[in-house]
Amino acid sequence: AKIATVGWCFGGSLSLKASILAGKQAAACVMYYGMPVKDVEQLKLLQTDVLGLFAGKEKFISTQVVAEFDANMKLAGKKLTLKSFDADHGFANPSNPIYDKASTEAAWDMAITYLKSKLK
């Protein structure tokens, strides 16, 4: 069976970790503003590419953290598609005061398009 993972925040980190653990069954991985795995040896185990949707105004998972993730994925020989939105952490949560409708809709469209392409 093919496995696709999607997660937000802590779940975004778990999405990446679950895709690593899924091995050859991993078909797609979407992570919304989750802390990336930093260990290049772990990233080498990925059997799918990753769509990373990040919050450009985020302070904890900063643009530096995202750039390091990009570099580590390249070192691991893995494909990463990154998009950073002009929004803060939690932008896709409608119950959050910093909810950003435009960023949420754009991220959702990217995620759905990616998942459809990977799960044919």
Regions found by a protein language model. Give the residues of each.
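Alpha/beta-hydrolase fold nucleophile elbow
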Residues: 1-8
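Short glycine-enriched nucleophile-adjacent loop
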Residues: 12-23, 29
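Alpha-helical scaffolding within the catalytic cores
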Residues: 34-41
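Short beta-strand/loop motif that positions the catalytic acidic residue
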Residues: 46, 52-54
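Acidic catalytic loop of the alpha/beta-hydrolase fold
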Residues: 57-61
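Short alpha-helix in the alpha/beta-hydrolase fold that links the catalytic acid
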Residues: 62-72
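C-terminal catalytic histidine-bearing segment of alpha/beta-hydrolase fold enzymes
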Residues: 74-120
